[in-house]
A protein has these predicted regions:
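Membrane-interfacial helix-loop-helix connectors in multipass membrane proteins
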Residues: 126-150, 220-247
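Extended amphipathic alpha-helical segments with heptad-repeat/coiled-coil character used for oligomerization
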Residues: 151-154, 210-214
Length: 311
């Protein structure tokens, strides 16, 4: 039974958080995430080893590693969104390309959300500036402080929900402004339902992550305990010795190996919060009229463009 058939068999709760383990059995997402994180880890390790030659190498390789990790995360997110929707899987390479091409949209959406939240904080600062007036200022603060606290709290709630579902919206094929508008509609109409699902999913993800990292950590200690008397102690950062396989640089190689183990485990575990976002998006985007929201957003953008053109 493929994932589409499993989804059809769960029509009552097609986007339940108890579908989280499906993310770990989706080998396409595991492959995309694991390959990107493993490659990023190798690039980071290579950059640290070349740091003694020039500071340029760790900077460039670190930046490339960051892009690779984010692109892989995005590609895995596209795959998990397909899984949540019950759509047929694409190829692993297709998900890698989709993740890479999603990066500009994700960056744009992130910047717009930061600007919106910054605008809220600027508004709060302006109100407080008005309340600084002598005489009437203290009276205004009596009313302003509760309203400002409520405003910032609602902004934080909306920002938290939006951050969790805007990415999956983009992975689902939505344009940036459409994704933000739909996320705003979900936040406005289903704030506590959405945040409850997100928090519940993240708690389950955290429990599983603790189990995985606990197992990996204990296993690493056992291997390290066996390696210490066999290999010996020492951490000489000698690149030629590491490549040549002699001297205490064995421990440098072991350190790189441990880093790769934890990077790979992280890639595996991080699939779960991605699945939480995908399931939340799929459930609540079906509860709003996406077509009407898209049309209203396009109309508003056309009005803005027309007014800008007049100047």
């Amino acid at each position: 039974m493929n994932h589409a058939q499993r989804l059809l068999a769960k029509d009552d709760h097609p986007y339940s958080i108890f579908r989280l383990p499906e993310a770990l059995s989706c080998w396409q997402a595991v492959a995309v995430m694991g390959a990107s994180y493993l490659s990023a880890g190798l690039l980071g390790a290579l950059g640290s080893m070349l740091a003694h030659t020039s500071i340029v190498f760790p900077l460039l390789l670190g930046l490339l590693a960051l892009v690779l990790a984010i692109a892989g995360t995005s590609g895995a997110g596209v795959c998990l969104t397909d899984l949540a929707r019950g759509r047929p899987y694409r190829g692993v390479l297709s998900y890698c390309v989709a993740g890479l091409f999603s990066l500009p949209k994700l960056v744009g959406a992130g910047l717009l959300m930061l600007l919106l939240y910054g605008a809220v904080l600027v508004g709060v600062a302006l109100v407080l500036l008005v309340c600084k007036l002598p005489g009437i200022g203290p009276v205004l603060l009596v009313v302003a402080v509760p309203l400002l606290v409520l405003t910032v709290a609602l902004a934080l709630l909306g920002y938290y929900v939006a951050v969790s579902i805007v990415g999956p919206a983009i992975w689902d094929g939505e344009r940036v402004m459409h994704a933000l508008s739909i996320a705003w509609s979900i936040t406005r109409n289903h704030p506590f339902e959405a945040i409850g699902k997100i928090v519940g999913g993240l708690l389950l993800s955290g429990i599983f992550a603790a189990m995985v990292f606990g197992l990996v950590g204990i296993s690493s200690l056992i291997v390290g305990g066996l390696a210490a008397p066999i290999i010996g102690v020492g951490m000489s950062l000698d690149w030629s010795a590491l490549v040549g396989g002699y001297g205490s640089s064995h421990w440098v190689g072991a350190g790189v190996g441990y880093a790769l183990v934890f990077v790979t485990a992280s890639a595996f575990v991080f699939l779960l919060p991605l699945m939480v976002g995908a399931l939340t998006w799929c459930e609540f985007s079906d509860k709003v009229d996406r077509g009407t929201i898209r049309s209203a957003t396009d109309s508003a953008l056309q009005d803005v463009n027309a007014r800008v053109a007049e100047f």
